């Protein structure tokens, strides 16, 4: 957490990423009556049997574990939608499909605690895992093709994925930037070929550690 | 206790009114963690959060005494735990950050207590270094702050690494100046919700004003 050895590259631990995801709102169907809850983080409720209501993920899991509600799986988690997304991810080498920012964490928590609330659970689960694999693989291959710039835009990457690639990308971009600045006068071609070589050196190390 | 209505992204005023303190604390914690230097210490926010936490702690004790449904009590306790976790992590980050920093700018941002802590810490560190190592080095190299008497600046003090890259997302459409000083000004435009890996220096102002979040 706060005790990091390398202060230059801050990392969130997976638990912290999950913590942040737990504030996402999900829909549940309570099976009991309960008054409104006035939390520090907000007001939720009231809870009426069979009336769906939106609560943060952590609260939903807590209620579910005590048998007080069932989950309504989010729209994006249907077999059809996920199959479509998987197809689209496989087709394009460079763009990522739009998925909720915390889809990994949400999916994992739902699988762990709410299996019976998800239709075709096994199918959904394997789809999500496939999507994760394809996206991670895409991220890895794309990382080798940066041109050195000051800003890189990546759309639709999720929280967990960002966290995984963050240290490497930061180091790579820093290296580009450092080498870019004093060479502003050098011929463009020489610079881009040098960047190519740079790309070849940097990716190997951190990825192989896995 | 603030209510957490759906921030539909319309008027900024509404978003401000409906963001709970916990949300703000979470944002401050996230930004602080991802940034390469200490950000402005959110004293008022921390105090408000502390107050609310204490209030809830008392309420929970009351609930337990009055025999309210233990389920409800445990849920309030969970919410409390989450808020406490955020607060503690945030304070811990502040303390850790200035183990490495001792620049003037950092001092401006720290709270009073932290300044006291920092000076004490720095003094202890200096003494420790002196006794163990520096006295054994040749005379020119004996300062904690300078690499040698020849250096003009305090170059033994690690400067915050402002040129590093961070991941960020903007809340609204934002247009930023990419290059500084004499180079051709280029701008990068960030739509709402886009993710960027970008140099910290460029987005620093925007983060302080709350337009951009670090991730």
Swiss-Prot record, chain A:
The record's subcellular location field reads: Nucleus
Cellular component GO terms, alphabetical: nuclear chromosome
- Where is the stretch described as Disordered? 182-210
Picking any one GO biological process from the record gives: DNA replication
Keyword flag Protease: no
Relate the protein's function as given in its record.
Answer: The GINS complex plays an essential role in the initiation of DNA replication.
Question: What protein name is recorded for this chain?
Answer: DNA replication complex GINS protein PSF2
